[in-house]
Each structure stands twice: as C-alpha cells, then as structure tokens.
C-alpha cells in the first residue's frame, strides 16, 4: 500500500478527464498496485472482474464507478475526503458503506451495506467474484464452507434489495437478478 505522502502526491497531480468511471479506474489501479486478491492475482484484476459483472447487469455509471472503488478505503489507503474531492456524494457514500469498520462484526458490516442500494449491488458482484474464484469440482472443506458463506451473504443482500422500491421495474427483473446471482 502507498504511503499517505504518495497518495497526496497522486491526488495533487491527477488530471481528471471528467469521465467518472475512468477516474475511478485510475484511482483503483494506482491504489492497488502490487496487491494480490484471494487467488494470488493482482487485486486490480478482481476489481475489473467485479466491474465486468456490474456491466453485464447493465448497471449505470455511478454503480460501475463504485465497483472500481469498492476496496479503495480498506485496501488502498484512500480516505472518504480523498474521494469526495473527485466523486459525487452518492458515489463516495456508497464506497463508505462498503468499507469495513475494523471494530464491527460481519453482521454489523452487512447492516451498514444494507443501508445503500448501490452498495448492495456492488457487494453482490464482489461476493460473486470471490465465490467464482473457489468454484471447482473438488473443493476443500474450507472452500466448501466459504461457498456456503458467500451464497448465504448473496441471498441476504438480494433480499435486502426489496426495500428499495425503484430497484426493479418488475417482479421478473427481481427473479432474473436472483437467478444470475446463484
């Protein structure tokens, strides 16, 4: 992870193109340089796969932007203040909902995510990618139980979308989204 000095230099010299998704991609690529995901690949490749899932679900630009930034507070050394200089409030607030408070338990973390529709959508994509990494025909016990955990968490998050009335335009949209998440 970069030092605060490195991040401040990046922020001072960054020239935004005005494309929110491109800016988020640049931030994520910088923040996660040298970091690895759960499978030993670059963390940015995980970020890109999450974004690809969101693009496949035809999510809007703000959701795609949040997808790029979803690990930046926890693993990238950036702060909420850093994000607020470059991104609209709805984006950085969702990223804050996705960040872990190291003192809270997993249930409190998920309750925090459930307060934000964009955070829920991005977390479902994040967990779907994490689950895909361990999908194989002969999982170890640890992989099996991780899959069970990811499936349970995806189900919980998908159920949480129901409280956002604008989430789906029809019952069919909701059931189709749930099927894609399985």
Residue locations for each model-derived region?
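Active-site helical microenvironments for divalent-metal-assisted chemistry
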Residues: 1-182
């Amino acid at each position: 992870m970069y030092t605060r000095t490195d991040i401040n230099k990046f922020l001072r010299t960054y020239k935004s193109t005005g494309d929110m998704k491109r800016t988020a991609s640049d931030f994520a690529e910088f923040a996660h340089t040298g970091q690895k995901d759960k499978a030993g690949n670059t963390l940015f490749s995980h970020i890109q796969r999450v974004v690809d899932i969101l693009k496949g679900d035809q999510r809007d630009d703000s959701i795609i932007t949040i997808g790029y930034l979803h690990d930046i507070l926890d693993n990238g050394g950036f702060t909420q203040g850093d994000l607020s200089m470059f991104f609209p409030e709805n984006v950085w607030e969702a990223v804050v909902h996705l960040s872990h408070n190291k003192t809270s338990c997993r249930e409190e973390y998920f309750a925090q995510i459930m307060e934000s529709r964009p955070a829920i959508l991005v977390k479902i994509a994040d967990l779907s990618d994490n689950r895909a990494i361990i999908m194989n025909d002969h999982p170890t016990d640890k992989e099996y139980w991780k899959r069970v955990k990811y499936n349970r968490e995806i189900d919980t998050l998908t159920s949480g979308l129901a409280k956002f009335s604008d989430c789906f335009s029809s019952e069919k949209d909701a059931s189709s989204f749930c099927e894609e998440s399985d």
